[in-house]
Amino acid sequence: MIRELYFPTPVYIADLNEEGLNEQLERDIIAWSNRDKGLTRTNVKGWHSPTNMASLPEYKKLVNLLFEAQRTIYQQEHLDSEAYLGNMWANINPPGAMNRAHIHPNSLWSGVYYVKALPNSGYLKVDDPRAAASISRPKQKEGPTPSRLWREAHFEPKAGRLIMFPAWLTHCVDPNNSNDIRISISFNFLQKGMFIWLKLFTKNYLLIKFHI
């Protein structure tokens, strides 16, 4: 019998090893947080920077790395339009801080890059997007359950790790139970067809394009 899988939820993970990048990012983000009170979005007890991060020259190297990663994803996902890096921001979660469950509307792909993350500093949790699947909870055999049968997934933060996923995927960040701050950078990618809508209805939205 042939088995076919439909409606998958792709999550891309890469561990980047850019010498000196995280040290530079940590220094600049902490300095930014000292001069800007930040925003309140899904963050609880944490600092959320303004969302114009991609336009600041000190973050250009990371922006270029994100473009490279997104180019690969667009090719693998058979997307045939121009891609744009939309808003991008930094997060500082001190011990006890977390982020409530949310999605990223008006975007296509979302992601997070970890600048500093100790063990137990808060997993990224994503939920099964198939709402109808929650009506049944079949009993599973003993042993490891294949990821295609999970109802939620947890991703460990690690300095230098990049995780990218569809913007419609509900996700949250567990509390930071380490004894130090956790620093991450979040961002959203779009397509050319989404540009006009965002320009008309969204304020302070930075758009950067590249060709694939």
Where are these regions (language model features)?
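Non-heme Fe(II)/2-oxoglutarate
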Residues: 1-80
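A generic structural micro-feature
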Residues: 4-6, 82, 103-107, 177-181
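Short, solvent-exposed loop/turn segments at secondary-structure junctions
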Residues: 19, 118, 131, 169-171, ...
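Short intrinsically disordered coil segments
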Residues: 29, 126-130, 141, 200-205
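Active-site region of the double-stranded beta-helix
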Residues: 55-86, 94-108, 115-119
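A structural signal for short, well-ordered beta-strand segments
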Residues: 88-90, 111-113, 185-189
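Catalytic core of non-heme Fe(II) oxygenases with the double-stranded beta-helix
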Residues: 93-164, 195
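Catalytic core of Fe(II)/2-oxoglutarate
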Residues: 145-204, 210
